[in-house]
Each structure stands twice: as C-alpha cells, then as structure tokens.
Swiss-Prot record:
It comes from Corynebacterium aurimucosum (strain ATCC 700975 / DSM 44827 / CIP 107346 / CN-1). Residues 16-95 form the GIY-YIG domain. Keywords: Cytoplasm, DNA damage, DNA excision, DNA repair, Excision nuclease, SOS response. Its main location: cytoplasm. GO terms for biological process: nucleotide-excision repair; SOS response. It comes from the Bacteria. Residues 332-357 are annotated as: Disordered. This is UvrABC system protein C. GO terms for cellular component: cytoplasm; excinuclease repair complex. Signal peptide: none annotated. Belongs to the UvrC family.
Length: 684
C-alpha cells in the first residue's frame, strides 16, 4: 500500500478552477477519475484523516501512487472530459454501467447478405440490429414466432441455411409459411431484404401501415371468396394485436421519454430504465453496481429515507448511459452508410434513428447534482432541447413509481441470489471467523435491534441465522420494560436488558444429558424429555456470535451483562451506523471489513432483518396502544360488551356522563356490572 503523504500535492499548488483529476497506481495505470467545481477543495478531501474516508475511497487512496489534474473552462467541459477519460482508461474504482449481458434481445443480422432474425444474449456486435431487451427469454421467442407470421423471413443459423441450400428444399418453417425460403430461391435476396426492412420498421413503432396493408388484403380475399387466405390474414391481424399488447400504451400518444429509478443501500445500487416511445414501453434495462467514489455513502440508508448519494448516482448514470448510447448510434449509422455504399438499401422503410438515443424527456427520482451542466451536455449529445425533471403527479409519476418498484425488486433478487449461494455463505462465515479471531466459523449468529419513536412503545428484535440463512422459527421479540417507559428511552440500557433476558439461562440451556445417563432412559422418559426440550427450543442453542445494534457504548453494555452472567464462549460485536465498522469489546478502534467482502454482505443482511422485525413489532405495539380504550381494564367486560356500551351511548365521553341505572339498561348488563363500569370510569 502506498503512503498518501508521499504523493500529496504541495500546499497551494492545486488550482481552485473546475477540472478533472486522475489517480494512478505505481504502474502508472489510471485507477480513478473524478471531476470537481473546485479542484483544490475536492482533492484536499482525499488527503485529510484517512480513517474518515469511505472504505472504498480509502482503498483507492492507499492504492494510488500519484495524482494529476487538468483544468477546464467550465463544469460542462469537466463532465465531458470525465466521461471521456472513464471510457478511455476504464478505472477500477469508478462505477461503470456496462451493457447487461443477461437480458435477452431480438436481433436482426442486417449486415448479412441474407439477414436473419434470432434470439440473442451478449455484447452488441457490428452489423446486427437489436430490439429489446426483454424481461424473459420466452418473450423474445413468442415475439419472433408472431413476427414470422407477418414477416416470413429467415431465422436459421448459417449451417442450417447452407444445408438446405445444398439439399434444394426448405425447412419446416418454409413449408408452413413462416419463412420465405431464400435458401432455395423462392424469393430473391432483394425481396427478402424488403421483408426484413418491413420487420425493422414495425419494431421501430411504425405499425399502422402494416396493419392497414394486412386488413386490406384480408378484405380483398374475402371479396374474392378466398376464405382460407382471409382466415390466415385474420390470424395475422391477431398476431399484430398481440405484439402491440406487449407494448401497452402507458402515456399519451407522441410521448417519448426515458424513466430512470434507483434502489440502493450503503453497499450497492440497482437502476432500472424504461424506454417509452410514442406512449408505449419499447424497452427495459437494469443494472446492479457497487457504490464507490462520489456515489458512495458511509451511513445506513433507512427504508423511506432519502439517499444522500442519489443525485450523484443519477448524474453519473445519465452522462455514462447517454454518451454510450449516442456513440453506439453513430457506429450503427456508420455501418448503415457502408452497406449503402455497397448498394444495399437496408432501411428504406425504417424510422429515422437520429435523435432516438436520447428522448425529449428524461424523468428521474431526483435531479442530478449539477442539473444545468448535465442538461447542457445531454442537449449537445442530442442536438436538441431536452427536459430532465422529477414528475410530481399524474401518469408519469405513477409510471416512475413502477420503475422504482422494479429497481427495488431487482436489488432484492440480487441479494437473494447471493444469500442462496452456498459458496458465498461459506466464504462469509470464514471471513467473519478470521476478522474476529474466532476459533471456529459462527454457524449460529444472533442479532438484536431496538425500535421506538421518542421513547414510546420501545421494543427489540432478536433474529437468528444458521449457516448464513435466517431461521425464523427462532426469532424473538421483546417489549423493553426496565430501560424505557413514560416517554423515555435508553438505547444502551435497552441493549443491556435484551442481552440479559436472552442469556439469563445461558448456562442451563447448554447442559445436556450425559451419554451414560441416556443409555438407561426409557422410551417414555425420552419422549417427556424431548417434549420439554421442544418447549425451550428457542433458547437451547447458544450462538457463536452475538451482534448488537450500535457502536462502542452498546457493545460495552452487552459485555457488562456477559461479565455479570459469566459468559465467555460467545463472541460479541456491535454494528455502528457505518456498516463496515465492527466494534469489538475493549477495542478503541473498530474492525474494518472490506466493502466488497461476503462477510460484510452477511452482516448487512442480518442487520436489515433485525431492523425489519423490530420496526414491524414496534408498529404493531403502537397500533395496539392507539386502539386501546379506558374500558379495556374493566374486570368482567369482554370485547362484545365493550362494543355494545360504546354503540349504545355513542362515545366513551357520553358513557362517563351516564348513571349506574342508565348503564344497567344496556342489554347484558346487570346492576353489579353496571356499578363496576361506573366505578372504574370515575375512579380518578
């Protein structure tokens, strides 16, 4: 690791102008590119107290061996140069939104002499037009099946095409009319390309001419009594309608917009983008990236809270995504020009693609950090005005919320995929063992969290993970009694109370029946023993690792309880607001886990689960308290009689004004119960 003080620029040598900077490692490779309104202010942050830096930023600064910068005239130029350098150097510490290789697409090989349509996953290739991406592989295949009803074109691979060309007879699709069989000369290459052009035009949204043409042919066939042909054309219309249903109208006709939403935590961020063209969703894409640099946050992002790093995430994404899109569009235009020079009019019926890469509207959750500068850069790329904004109401707001839900689901599925990976779970437990100096991997981990609002309804959760997976049957919930009440709350005391209640019978729970005693146990005695064990199952397995919510004070409180109870065989740690900081009893400094480690991901999962259970229980208790009534404590008064009383008098206030005789008139109430209710209501 390099020493940042050795390459720190001399005081006063960094300009205060806007610019772009590069960190290089000892081999002169660029490892991070950033931009700044004020280079001196930004770069100085990297050379302050290194322990205060975000872990990934700290790793970058320690990996670097030098820093250099370039001054530019404006913040807009800084944005453009930053993107150029990121593309050129591919720095390891920058967030890169690369094409998602997992999404299936419909591809058309326009560069071939006899183009074909096919299902495709992978990086984009020259001479191929792509449509999608689609959410599922079956959606591509279904679309391709419907498209070949209307546009019978080649879908086979080169080997299949060559074989049937040699045989002189078409494949099955050629016989059933889903391919125009250019392999045997049924149509010329020019006629086949005309069919391909019509398909591309249709997929670009130009559906009306195709529908009109098929409808006209169907009516003509019916007039000429060609009912079999008319029926087939009717089915073709049905296929067109089904294809259009897959791109349902979600916004007014003529609306061209991209809707972008993020879902993030302190480690990763998922982004989803919906492409809406002429009011229909034409495509959807998604990525999950590790947060770093300006987009990283060190604090826990609570559910429902605004992510402070969101504007930086959005800004980085907009510049990268649309710059890449325009560059790709230019490459496709250059390929089209080459084909045209060869005398191939491969898109005479297609919609013009100029300007399609960046729509007129870009709808986001929050404006980017430097909204005006980003807008200028995007307008230069598009060559026309654009509107980057946050929709506040109506259909656009509703659709953006749908995009956000997709992003949340994507992040959730990404986490579940990691949780379900046995190798990743094993690595996480091994990393925890090494980081905490444990004798063995913590196969059973328990984590507690406190939840309350201004000292009311203070509760705690205790979640249990075994082999890295939740064991929900062992979860426990506590109402804090000693450390809270009357609107007061003591988080440190609450942690101590939960720890004491959890481990009060720790030594008793560990006792087992000796083997020699078991040998002389009858079947009946064994059944009684098993039944008793099942009733105390929740506490019968002590954890190897116990995690408390909080930093050094909370850990010290839990350790005091451990000392009081004589517990020495359970490792204790605390998770502070900075997730990667793991506090160990007696240590002045926290243990720092690598940000991309499986151990940190497991701790995040534990903390989130404990937080979820605590919040849920707190809401339940708060709701129960708000529904409670002064009648709940009246002895002998059940739910039905309480309801009858309130229904009879209209409210508790009017009930208090009633006499014993009036209460006794209510059905089911005698003089004795009426007197009890009256005395209870007027006891104060």
């Amino acid at each position: 690791m390099a020493d940042p003080s050795k390459y720190r620029p001399a005081p006063g040598s960094i300009p205060t102008d806007p610019g772009v900077y590069k960190f290089r490692d000892e081999n002169r490779r660029v490892i991070y590119v950033g931009k700044a309104k004020n280079l001196r202010a930004r770069l100085s942050n990297y050379f302050q107290d290194i322990t205060q830096l975000h872990p990934r930023t700290r790793q970058m600064v320690l990996t670097a061996a030098s820093v250099e910068w370039t001054v530019v005239a404006s913040e807009v130029e800084a944005l453009q140069l930053e993107y150029t350098w990121i593309k050129r150097f591919d720095p390891r510490f920058n967030v890169m939104y690369r094409d998602d290789k997992t999404y299936p697409m419909l591809a058309v090989s326009v560069g071939e002499s006899i183009p074909r349509a096919f299902f495709y996953r992978g990086p984009r290739r020259k001479g191929v037009r792509y449509f999608g991406p689609y959410s599922h592989a079956w959606a591509v295949r279904e679309s391709l099946d419907l498209l070949t009803r209307i546009f019978p074109m080649r879908t086979c691979a080169k080997g299949v095409f060559n074989r049937h060309e040699r045989l002189g007879r078409p494949c099955l699709l050629g016989y059933i009319g889903k391919c125009d069989a250019p392999c045997i000369g049924r149509v010329s290459p020019e006629e086949h390309r005309e069919t391909v052009n019509q398909l591309i035009s249709f997929m670009n949204g130009n559906t009306a001419p195709v529908r009109k043409r098929v409808t006209q042919r169907m009516e003509e066939a019916a007039e000429n009594l060609e009912f079999e042909l008319a029926a087939r054309l009717r089915d073709d219309l049905g296929a067109i309608d089904k294809l259009m249903e897959q791109q349902a109208v979600v916004l007014p006709d003529g609306t061209d917009a991209d809707l972008i939403a993020f879902s993030s935590d302190e480690l990763e961020a998922a982004v989803q983008i919906f492409h809406v063209r002429t009011g229909r969703i034409r495509g959807q894409r998604g990525w999950v990236v590790e947060r770093s640099g300006d987009q990283a946050t060190t604090d826990v992002v609570e559910e429902g809270q605004a992510d402070p790093g969101l504007p930086a995430l959005i800004q980085n994404f907009l510049i990268q995504f649309y710059s890449d899109a325009v560059e790709r569009q230019r490459q496709e235009a250059a390929e089209d020009a080459k084909l045209e020079r060869r005398g191939v009019d491969q898109e005479s019926h297609a919609e013009p693609r100029q300007g399609n890469a960046i729509p007129r509207e870009i709808l986001v959750q929050a404006l980017p950090e430097e909204a005006e500068e980003v807008k200028i850069v995007l307008e230069e790329l598009r060559g026309a005005q654009i509107d980057v904004r946050v929709p506040q109401r109506g259909d656009k707001r509703a659709l953006l919320e749908t995009v956000e839900r997709n992003a949340k689901e994507q992040l959730k599925q990404h986490k579940l995929k990691r949780v379900g990976d046995l190798t990743a779970r094993s690595a996480a437990l091994q990393e925890l063992q090494e980081a905490l100096g444990m004798d063995s991997a913590p196969l059973r981990i328990e984590c507690t969290d406190i939840s309350h609002i201004q000292g009311t309804d203070v509760v705690a959760s205790l979640v249990v993970f075994e082999d890295g997976l939740p064991r929900k049957s062992d979860y426990r919930r506590y109402r804090i009694k000693e450390a809270a009440g009357d609107g007061r709350s003591n988080d440190v005391g609450s942690i101590a109370e939960v720890t004491r209640r959890r481990f009060k019978h720790h030594h008793d729970d560990k006792r087992a029946v000796p083997d020699e005693e078991l040998e002389n146990t009858t079947f009946a005695e064994e059944m009684v023993r098993e039944e008793a064990a099942s009733q105390t199952k929740r506490s019968s397995y002590p954890p190897q690792l116990f995690i408390v919510d909080g930093g050094a004070p909370q850990v010290a409180a839990a350790q005091a309880v451990f000392d009081e109870l004589g517990i020495v065989d359970v490792t204790l740690i605390g998770l502070a607001k900075r997730l990667e900081e793991v506090w160990v009893p007696g240590d002045d400094e926290p243990v720092i886990l690598p940000r991309n480690s499986q151990a940190l991901f497991l701790l995040q999962h534990l903390r989130d689960e404990a937080h979820r259970v605590a919040i849920s229980y707190h809401r339940q208790q708060r709701s129960k308290r708000m529904r409670s009534s002064v009648l709940d404590a009246v002895p002998g008064l059940g739910p039905q009689r309480r309801t009858d009383l309130v229904k009879h008098f209209g409210s508790v206030k009017k009930l208090k004004e009633a006499s014993v005789e009036e209460i006794a008139e209510v059905k089911g109430f005698g003089p004795k119960l009426a007197q009890t209710v009256f005395d209870h209501l007027h006891a104060s």
